[in-house]
Swiss-Prot record:
Gene name for this UniProt entry: infB
Region called G1, residue ranges: 470-477
The name this protein goes by in its record: Translation initiation factor IF-2
Biased composition, class Gly residues, residue ranges: 281-336
Region (G2): 495-499
Biased composition (Pro residues): 77-87, 103-112
Job of this protein: One of the essential components for the initiation of protein synthesis. Protects formylmethionyl-tRNA from spontaneous hydrolysis and promotes its binding to the 30S ribosomal subunits. Also involved in the hydrolysis of GTP during the formation of the 70S ribosomal complex.
Region (G4): 574-577
HAMAP family the record matches: IF_2_B
Segments of this protein annotated with the region G5: 610-612
Annotated segments matching region G3: 520-523
Main location: cytoplasm
Length: 968
């Protein structure tokens, strides 16, 4: 089966595209929009979810032939006798039998309806009686109830179909006029009486017809029709007629459509000119209200004669008269009754009246306790769907609250809190953990229930996972190097660990071989997030403290991470062989943070080691195992699908995305389909820390995995899924959620107060960056450090793209479009990419140590700030005498008391210590009669301040200039 688009399948099932998309999301299938294509299994799943829709669709061709059939042929005519409360009438035969004797019975099933319609033309047309009476008509009523003129518009002698006339029923689903089965006497619909018909012309079914051919005789004048049976219609329904034939025509038929031209609005009878018979009642309702006795012809109720019918005549009490033709051409008839509003319309009006208005729009409000849950990075449209409001109205409300956003823009939690407080809602942004739990529940994945279902007999012992933490340059990597007997420090730049490594060693403990897994987390403050993730996956933390430096800020930070995760701590006092080492000082300092040594009566093990001299390494490993056995229950179930943590990932040139993962439970096999964060794929190969090929990895085993679609982030969880499609859908949903959350976090809030100023200044300056690195953890740490740089409100830093691997041509193209700077961390571009960057003028910078990158970007941000100016005083002058000049105004004859007075400099005048003139300019400066550029201390001069003339003797003129203030 080929792929099907969602909207095509929705049309086939008879549902809307939005309902189809929503149903697919409920079924756990991720589709982006109604234009997305879905596979055959998903199509079958959606078809099974709508069995009724599919059945009705398949039955539609069989039901289609029913449409041409007359209503009288599809249902038996009701007995008109019991429904006539005023005048009894005899039982009438079905019109179908009168018009088509060869047609099958009305009770024939649906498939026989086309055959009945086909045989109808073969029925002979009955001869028109000379009296104008219709066959099978009801007998004329008594004389005290004169009948109105009979209606015409078809073949005068042919009986009309007995079905309902939906053209007169405003609540009918179809406004068309059903066609009869009378062959040549077939009566077409009268669109002139149907205000909803596309054509208002009156068809002529029988060709041209002269006045003498009418069975009812000559037409009467307006309002002077012949008698009409005054008995009410049986049933009293809203315009629906039973299957009985209509009464016979009187000697004068109602003025209606016959021969001649087609009716137009100008041919309608004028209400003021038609003579009404004596004693006639007012016209009946225009098709809605109950018919009144009498009235002019064609105005809704049946026309009556002078005597009038009994009360409730016309079409009977509770019946509905036929609407006039005025409604078909414009304004309805004058006798139209008052329409009643439906309950739905009344409810909508009530909701609109009760909805408060803010900023000219009506929005539903909560009671102050209404809780609305939103995902991270939700938009106004998502919030509007929750409260059933118009997104445009919420945008207007937010605008009046001083915030600007579009309906589809991701908003942060503060903006939603402001909007919810105004509308009376308590908005709760779902945490990442709850969001992940809800996402997995859509795929029937529940890890919590799985853990509860495990029994003790299924659990087996596993090695402890140890994290080495501590301050920068305190010897963590060298200590791990001493444990592994390998050298990894030489590959680090500046002796700083740039990414996480995971290793497993084997040691002897109490005569048995025990395995220990080590995770080396960076100690630099920029890697706080990575160290926090390392503390979450570990069982025991080794806190490395240099004996000569003691406790440092990152030592305290690492200690707090371990304590927050309830991780037991073993303290390794390193560098005891160095001069100035004081292990007792370290013990005393850590006691202040709750780590009391066993020597002091506490429960924390302190081991003095020297990584350089390989001193007491075995004692440290023994302390780790003793702490693990005493404080932890290190067991896991290896007989299930694997779950764990992605410790580190990078992009290898020959192998693609390579992820270092730590299996926490279950067993990971080659060929398993896994999803790790936003990456997914099938495990093509596994390697241990020595490069050996593995086929499976049990709990607490770190391995390198090949086969992922992209590079996961450090700290992302991974687990095995049933198939690749499920893994891909989970990864795509995670990616969409992370993208919305990042957009909401990166959004720069602009209030209305400074919006005009920001526009006038050329908008907000933004430094766009593209970050590329060798490993994902380093890129993420660099991004976090850069986003923490605070240089004021005037500059915004924006990371438009981040990735792992070499700088590519796509990166240069993106930087060209967005005027971005490319930052390479331990990566270089290809030669062709570098030439493209030079040709496009893209700035690329390369770093191997994170300090230099942070410092350079911080300086660049400060250089982008608007220049700040400060006032610098140049000099002061005292006014000795004021000279009046018609050309230059008042000239202040002054003596310079301090500094220098320069021409065109800013000035202010103070009198008795109070400033009386500010923001002035020294427009003229003279020494005697000569112009001067500047005048120094103790020299006399003449100062002209332009049009400012409020100068008196004794005033002080102070001059100054605005100099750019250097940033620090």
């Amino acid at each position: 089966m080929a792929k099907v688009r969602v909207h095509e399948l929705a049309k086939e099932l008879g549902i809307t595209s939005k309902d189809a998309v929503t149903k697919l999301q409920e079924l756990g299938e991720f589709v982006r929009s109604a234009s997305s294509t879905i596979e055959a299994p998903v199509v079958r799943k959606l078809r099974n979810a709508y069995p009724a829709a599919g059945a009705s669709k398949s039955e539609a061709p069989a039901a289609a032939p029913k449409a041409p059939a007359s209503p009288a042929a599809t249902r038996p005519a009701p007995a008109p006798g019991p429904a006539a409360p005023k005048a009894p009438e005899p039982k009438a035969e079905a019109p179908a039998a009168a018009s088509a004797p060869s047609a099958p019975a009305p009770a024939a099933p649906a498939p026989a309806a086309p055959a009945a319609a086909a045989s109808a033309p073969s029925a002979p047309a009955p001869a028109a009686p000379s009296t104008g009476a219709k066959p099978g008509a009801r007998p004329a009523p008594k004389a005290e109830a004169p009948a109105a003129p009979a209606r015409s518009g078809g073949q005068g002698s042919a009986p009309r179909p007995g079905g309902p006339r939906p053209g007169n029923n405003p609540f009918a689903t179809s406004q068309g006029m059903p066609r009869g089965r009378g062959g040549d006497n077939e009566r077409p619909p009268r669109p002139g009486n149907n205000p909803f018909a596309p054509s208002q012309g009156m068809p002529r079914p029988g060709g041209s017809r002269t006045e003498g051919e009418r069975p009812g005789g000559p037409r009467p004048a307006a309002g002077a029709g012949g008698p009409r049976p005054g008995a009410p219609r049986p049933g009293g329904t809203q315009g629906a007629r039973p299957g009985a034939p209509r009464p016979a025509g009187a000697p004068g038929a109602r003025p209606g459509a016959g021969g001649g031209n087609r009716p137009t609005p100008g041919m309608m009878p004028n209400r003021t000119e038609r003579p009404a018979p004596a004693g006639a009642g007012r016209p009946g309702g225009g098709g809605r209200g109950p018919g009144r006795p009498g009235g002019a012809p064609g105005t809704g109720g049946a026309p009556g004669a002078g005597g009038g019918a009994p009360a409730g005549g016309g079409f009977g009490k509770g019946g509905r008269g036929r609407g006039g033709t005025q409604g078909a051409f414009g304004k309805g008839g004058a006798g139209r009754g008052k329409q009643r509003k439906s309950k739905r319309a009344k409810r909508q009006e009530l909701e609109q009246m009760s909805a408060p208005s803010l900023g000219g729009v009506s929005v539903p409000r909560g009671d102050g306790n209404t809780v609305v849950r939103l995902r991270r990075g939700s938009s106004i449209t998502d919030f509007a769907d929750k409260i059933e409001a118009n997104p445009a109205a919420l945008v207007t409300v937010l605008f009046h609250l001083g915030e600007m956003a579009t309906a589809t823009q991701s908003l942060d939690e503060e903006t939603f809190a402001l909007l919810g407080e105004e509308l009376g809602y308590k908005l709760q942004v779902v945490s990442p953990e709850d969001e992940e739990r809800e996402l997995l529940s859509g795929f029937d994945i529940d890890f919590d229930a799985e853990l509860e279902a495990e029994g003790d007999e299924e659990l087996e012992a596993r090695p402890p996972v140890v994290t080495v933490m501590g301050h920068v340059d305190h010897g963590k990597t060298r200590l791990l190097d001493a444990i592994r007997n390998s050298d990894v420090v030489a590959g680090e730049h500046g002796g700083i660990t740039q990414h996480i490594g995971a290793y497993q060693i084997t040691t002897e403990h109490e005569g048995a071989e025990r395995k220990i897994t080590f995770i080396d987390t960076p100690g630099h403050e920029a890697f706080t997030a990575m160290r926090a993730r390392g503390a979450k996956v570990t069982d025991i933390a080794i806190l490395v403290v240099a004996a000569d430096d003691g406790v440092m800020p990152q030592t305290v930070e690492a200690l707090n991470h371990a304590q927050a995760a309830n991780v037991p701590i073993v303290v390794a006092v390193n560098k005891i062989d160095k001069e100035g080492a004081n292990p007792d000082k370290v013990r005393g300092q850590l006691t202040e943070y709750g780590l009391v040594p066993e020597e002091y009566g506490g429960d924390t093990m302190f081991v003095e080691v020297s990584a350089r001299q390989n001193l007491n390494i075995d004692e440290l490993l023994e302390a780790v195992l003793l702490t693990a056995d005493a404080a932890l229950d290190m067991r896991a179930n290896p007989n299930k699908d694997a779950r764990g943590i992605a410790i580190e990932a990078n992009l290898d040139k020959g192998r693609g995305a390579v992820a270092t993962v730590l299996v926490q439970s279950g067993t990971l096999h080659v060929g398993d389909t896994i999803v790790a964060g936003t990456a997914h794929g099938r495990v093509r190969a596994m390697f241990d820390d020595d490069g050996s090929v593995l086929t499976e990895a049990g709990p607490s085993r770190p391995v390198q995995v090949l086969g992922l679609s992209n590079v996961p982030r450090a700290g992302d969880t991974f687990f095995v899924t049933a198939d690749e499609r499920t893994a891909r859908q989970i990864a795509e949903k995670r990616e969409a959620a992370d993208r919305n959350a990042a957009l909401a976090k990166r959004r720069k809030r602009i209030s209305l107060e400074d919006f005009d100023q920001a526009v006038a200044e050329g908008k907000i300056d933004t430094l766009n960056l593209i970050l590329k690195g060798d490993v994902s953890g380093a890129v993420e740490a660099l991004e976090d450090a850069l986003l923490k740089i605070d240089v004021g409100e005037g500059v915004q830093l924006r990371v438009i793209h981040r990735g792992v691997g070499a700088i590519t041509q796509n990166d240069v193209n993106l930087a060209t479009v967005d005027s971005a700077v490319i930052i390479g961390f331990n990566v270089k571009p290809a030669e062709r990419v570098a030439e493209l960057a030079d040709r496009e003028g893209v700035d690329m910078r390369f770093y191997s140590v994170i300090y230099a990158a942070i410092d350079d970007i911080e300086m660049a941000l400060k250089g982008m700030l608007k220049p700040e100016y400060e006032e610098v005083q140049l000099g002061t002058a005292e006014v000795r005498e004021v000279f009046r000049s018609s050309k230059f105004g008042n000239i202040a004859g002054s003596i310079v008391r301090s500094g220098v007075i320069r021409r065109n400099s800013k000035a202010r005048i103070s009198r008795d210590g109070k400033i009386i003139g500010d923001n002035l300019t020294v427009e003229t400066l003279k020494r005697f009669k000569d112009d001067a550029t500047e005048v120094r201390t103790d020299f006399e001069c003449g100062i002209g301040l332009g049009s400012y003339n409020d100068i008196n003797e004794g005033d002080i003129i102070e001059t100054f200039e605005m100099r750019e203030k250097p940033r620090v």
